[in-house]
Amino acid sequence: MCTHSMITDTKLRKALGKKRDDIEIISDSHGLNARISQAGKISFFYRYRWAGKAVKLNVGDYPAMSITQARERRQQFRNWLTEGLDPREQVKLDKQTRQEAMSVAEAFNYWIERHCIANGLVKVDYYRQVFEKHIAEPMKNVKVDNTAKMHWINVFDSIESRVMAHYMLSLCKRAFRFCVNRSVIASNPLEGLLPSDVGQKPKKRTRRMDDDDLRKIYQWLKSHMSIESVFLVKFIMLTGCRTAEIRLSERSWFRLDDNEWVVPAGSYKTRVHIRRGLSDAAVNLVRNHLKKINTNHLVTSQRKIDGGIKDSPVHSPVASNYARSIWNGTGMAEWSLHDMRRTIATNLSELGCPPHVIEKLLGHQMVGVMAHYNLHDYIDDQKHWLRVWQSHLEEIIGEPFS
């Protein structure tokens, strides 16, 4: 039986779940209909013509879908028809898109693989580590396109460190922006949300070790910690290099007869080939260390596999803890390995080292016009001022640096 009055909520509520002798069809307008089965089940369907043939397309079930929602869906079907599209095909495509929609983890990994790894970014392991720690579990199996800003605010608010919350928002925002541009997710749920809305930037560090601090560090290294940790800290004390550069270093990076070492392009954030000088003490430090190890990497984990040391670099948090162990053990004020770079740069400046040489010693790229036209690495100047720094250190510790 078919009636042609408009569909109303009152009619449908009265008919819902009540048995009847015949199936009833209630027509609304512009092709929308409600079907009431003999068992009292109500469903919406849409009638239209395609290629000269009558078509009936399911819209949804009442009351899970309201009348308003059914009418909105009907309007979508009509719009598709106006555009020359068959609603049946569009419904299939919509369903496929929902089924293939990326989860938060899938979208993040897509960015890692298609952007970070493809472009040689070196902090990939760290990105994955912090994502697993702070985002993966609360957003487990959740589709990106199903998330809203409020969901993300709750996740970021649950991160204990406000600095890390600030960092994670920036990181995820970058990842999702890339995915939107590649059309693998529909929109960026973090668009418009500022890092300052959920956290704060890390405070600018000003820690500089004084002579007494440097003396304590050197004396502590004489009788504490593993050979890897002692080597890494001493090498940074002599060169001012980034922790990651020596942590990831391999035998082939060193040209000890020339008092040089090279950080290959792609091995750290600058992604350019960097040649650095070495003082005599640094050369001897490396030579002595190479005699003690049988791995390609100079700073490896102590974990043994099949009776041998695993030939892979120690992870960043492990290296960072080397400094913590020292200031905890000596009772010094807190400092980080990165503070050692600031200490060396400041001391060298006070000793008269030109700023451009300090920049090269630190592995920084030139800025402005010099970045484009001056590619000189001042290697002889680097070696000279590293010898000056070695002599200054030896005056502080009161003995040859070894």
Curated annotation (Swiss-Prot):
GO biological process, one term: establishment of integrated proviral latency
Domain Core-binding (CB), first and last residues per copy: 102-180
InterPro entries per record: CB, DNA_brk_join_enz, Integrase-like_cat_sf, Integrase_catalytic, Integrase_DNA-bd_sf, Integrase_DNA_bind_dom, Integrase_recombinase_N, Phage_Integrase
Record's keyword terms, sorted: DNA integration, DNA recombination, DNA-binding, Hydrolase, Transferase, Viral genome integration, Virus entry into host cell
GO molecular function term, any single one: DNA binding
Active site annotation, chain numbering: R242, K269, H338, R341, H364, Y373
Pfam families listed in its UniProt record: Arm-DNA-bind_3, Phage_integrase
Record-annotated Tyr recombinase domain positions: 204-390
EC number(s) from the headed UniProt entry: 2.7.7.-, 3.1.-.-
Coiled-coil intervals: none
PANTHER family documented for this protein: PROPHAGE INTEGRASE (PTHR30629), PROPHAGE INTEGRASE INTS-RELATED (PTHR30629:SF2)
Protein task: Integrase is necessary for integration of the phage into the host genome by site-specific recombination. In conjunction with excisionase, integrase is also necessary for excision of the prophage from the host genome.
Family: Belongs to the 'phage' integrase family.
Protein name: Integrase
Gene from which this protein is expressed: int
